[in-house]
Amino acid sequence: MAEDIHELYAIRYGHHARRSPDNFIGGDLHDVLQPLDFFVWAIVGPSGTIVLDTGFDEAMGKKRQREMIKPVRDGLAALGIAADSIKDVIISHLHYDHCGNYDLFPQARYHLQDREMAYATGRCMCHQALRAPFEVDDVVAMVRKVFAGRCAFHDGEDEIVPGVTVHHIGGHSKGLQSVRVKTRLGPIVLAADASHLYAHMDGGRVYPLTYNVEEVVEGYARLKRLAAAPGHVVPGHDPLVLKRYPAARPGLEGWVVRLDAEPKQV
C-alpha cells in the first residue's frame, strides 16, 4: 500500500425511522418511509487509522429517540481497530450524532474547523432553533480537549496525513467539513452532513435543519468535483450506502461496509 492510499469503511451504529417529508425543505409529495442511518467512518492507511466522527451512545440515543444498533466501539472492533489506539479523529461538525462518545478515544487528537467551534460556543447558541442539534456536554467536552492540547483547528482546506484532506463546506452547520480520501479507486469524498442522502445532492434538495441554504446547494457541486467521479461521494445518513457497498467481511452485512469499492446501482 502506498503511503497515501487508504482503505475506507462506513460503520452503522444507529437508525431513525421517519418519513420523507421530514427530510426536505418543502416536504415531499411522495410521503414515503425514508429512514436515516447513523454512521462513523474508519480511514485505514499505512500510518494508522483515522476515525471520522464519534457518534452517540445509548443514553443519547434514548434522549433523542434514536435507535442504537451497535456501539461505535464494537463496529471498530469488528475491523480489528481498538478505540484507545486511535491517534486522530476528524469531527465533521459538533451536532450530537457526530461528536458524542467523547471519552471513547483517550489518545486521539481531534480535528475540526475554527468556524465550527466558534459557532457552537458563540451567539448563535442563544437561539433554540440553531442550538437544537447540539448537546452542551459534547461541546464542553470539546472545549476541555482544547485546553488539554488535544485539538487541531483547520480553516478551510487542510491535509491531515498524505492522502486525507478536510474541506470546509458549511451549510448544514457553520463549520461543517467533509473529508477527501485517496484510495485505490481514486479520491472518495465522505460528505458527512454536507449531503444526508443521495437524494439531497442528486436532486439539489436541502435537509430542513440548515444554517445556510446557499452553502448547502453550492456544496453539492464542490463535493462532486473533489471526488474521482460523482458516484464516489458518500452521503452521511443514507441507508442505501449499506446496499451499494459490500460488507467489509463476511458476517458484517448491514453493519460495516467497505467504501473503496465500486458502488452498485440500487
Annotate each PLM feature.
Residues 2-8, 44-49, 158-165, 183-187:
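Beta-strand-turn-beta hairpins that frame and shape the catalytic cleft
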Residues 8, 43, 53, 86, ...:
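Divalent metal-coordination and catalytic microenvironments
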Residues 2, 70-81, 85, 115-168, ...:
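Metallo-beta-lactamase
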